[in-house]
Amino acid sequence: MPYFDNISTIAYEGPASKNPLAFKFYNPEEKVGDKTMEEHLRFSVAYWHTFTGDGSDPFGAGNMIRPWNKYSGMDLAKARVEAAFEFFEKLNIPFFCFHDVDIAPEGETLKETYKNLDIIVDMIEEYMKTSKTKLLWNTANLFTHPRFVHGAATSCNADVFAYAAAKVKKGLEIAKRLGAENYVFWGGREGYETLLNTDMKLELDNLARFLHMAVDYAKEIGFDGQFLIEPKPKEPTKHQYDFDVATALAFLQTYGLKDYFKFNIEANHATLAGHTFEHELRVARIHGMLGSVDANQGDMLLGWDTDEFPTDLYSTTLAMYEILKNGGLGRGGLNFDAKVRRGSFEPEDLFYAHIAGMDSFAVGLKVAHRLIEDRVFDEFIEERYKSYTEGIGREIVEGTVDFHKLEAHALQLGEIQNQSGRQERLKTLLNQYLLEVCAAR
């Protein structure tokens, strides 16, 4: 049955359009550089927020109006698949993502859970045969059920470690079967509340053992998708071990895992860690670890993960700047790990939200491309660091000096003259480029 029968396929109508159910800036076939927008942006729908989210919060029950919610159990799971692929087709979106429990309910036993998953994966596989929408990534939910109260791979209970491994094993089999481009690990419960009851070294060692086993099993079954770590500093756990890109990178390097993983970077997780979105993207990029993106934004006045749809054009521009500098996202994409606000409870709000996010990143792509083409920031940065291309600076970079030679050089210096960083001028240029793209017809 149709679930969005009052919605037509969303088309590009251009900036002058007043149609709220049309793209104003995202034209999938438009070339930006040597790729189309669709190839650059690789948009993805998050199954959990879009099809299972009910709008509930700590202060109120679910209020979302969803046509499929008249069903329950496995009938509900099947209805969600039907609704999802109708949504994908009408939005003309190339990818989707899910956790295992998003697509099928857990059973009384692990075997029953596997059975439920198999039934729904069969159904998804059939839909994918005639759909352009592919699986960007899947993952195992290792945080919702009470068994994971003390963590999954970092749990103090070895039985929980084993159960988590079984879920990831099944998840990797599903990833291979559905042709997933990536597989994600997000450790929402991998951390601690207090050191008074925590063996941190054992927990970190066990987390590494767990990830090595996952790498080994992926090789065993021939799954060649990219493994992704998704950093987050807190929520639900006070001290999470994958706090930010730098922390997670140190972990991967320490345990010999760096060659097998890249990062799935979420904008709102960056701000929770006290960073900008583009900071986390830059750290990952310069270390060759930028794999995929969870596209959303947080509310700077709130201290939690609000998962809003991305509409901040400065943020999307600076994010796309890093992504283009990275040569794209490879097998990754821009997954809308975002939810409509509790007050936006009607089905069509799902379309308005995704259109807003897709248009915002389309603008960001075009602005970032022009900034890079015109070398707006590159030229300034090259001039700013010019002292390292000649004289003593070049010797520092080439590693041909020591403290003795540097001291001798410093003793010969007079008053050192620095130059302005011109931050305000550069922000004005960013504004100019953004406004020019938005004003273009």
UniProtKB/Swiss-Prot annotation:
<feature type="binding site">
    <location>
        <position position="266"/>
    </location>
    <ligand>
        <name>Mg(2+) 2</name>
    </ligand>
</feature>
<dbReference type="GO" id="GO:0042732">
    <property type="term" value="P:D-xylose metabolic process"/>
</dbReference>
<dbReference type="GO" id="GO:0000287">
    <property type="term" value="F:magnesium ion binding"/>
</dbReference>
<dbReference type="GO" id="GO:0005737">
    <property type="term" value="C:cytoplasm"/>
</dbReference>
<dbReference type="InterPro" id="IPR036237">
    <property type="entry name" value="Xyl_isomerase-like_sf"/>
</dbReference>
<dbReference type="GO" id="GO:0009045">
    <property type="term" value="F:xylose isomerase activity"/>
</dbReference>
<keyword id="KW-0479">Metal-binding</keyword>
<comment type="subunit">
    <text>Homotetramer.</text>
</comment>
<feature type="binding site">
    <location>
        <position position="269"/>
    </location>
    <ligand>
        <name>Mg(2+) 2</name>
    </ligand>
</feature>
<comment type="similarity">
    <text>Belongs to the xylose isomerase family.</text>
</comment>
<feature type="active site">
    <location>
        <position position="99"/>
    </location>
</feature>
<comment type="function">
    <text>Exhibits xylose isomerase activity.</text>
</comment>
<feature type="binding site">
    <location>
        <position position="305"/>
    </location>
    <ligand>
        <name>Mg(2+) 2</name>
    </ligand>
</feature>
<keyword id="KW-0963">Cytoplasm</keyword>
<dbReference type="InterPro" id="IPR001998">
    <property type="entry name" value="Xylose_isomerase"/>
</dbReference>
<feature type="active site">
    <location>
        <position position="102"/>
    </location>
</feature>
<keyword id="KW-0119">Carbohydrate metabolism</keyword>
<feature type="binding site">
    <location>
        <position position="266"/>
    </location>
    <ligand>
        <name>Mg(2+) 1</name>
    </ligand>
</feature>
<feature type="binding site">
    <location>
        <position position="337"/>
    </location>
    <ligand>
        <name>Mg(2+) 1</name>
    </ligand>
</feature>
<feature type="binding site">
    <location>
        <position position="307"/>
    </location>
    <ligand>
        <name>Mg(2+) 2</name>
    </ligand>
</feature>
<keyword id="KW-0859">Xylose metabolism</keyword>
<dbReference type="InterPro" id="IPR013452">
    <property type="entry name" value="Xylose_isom_bac"/>
</dbReference>
<keyword id="KW-0413">Isomerase</keyword>
<keyword id="KW-0460">Magnesium</keyword>
<protein>
    <recommendedName>
        <fullName>Xylose isomerase</fullName>
        <ecNumber>5.3.1.5</ecNumber>
    </recommendedName>
</protein>
<dbReference type="InterPro" id="IPR013022">
    <property type="entry name" value="Xyl_isomerase-like_TIM-brl"/>
</dbReference>
<feature type="binding site">
    <location>
        <position position="230"/>
    </location>
    <ligand>
        <name>Mg(2+) 1</name>
    </ligand>
</feature>
<feature type="binding site">
    <location>
        <position position="294"/>
    </location>
    <ligand>
        <name>Mg(2+) 1</name>
    </ligand>
</feature>
<dbReference type="Pfam" id="PF01261">
    <property type="entry name" value="AP_endonuc_2"/>
</dbReference>
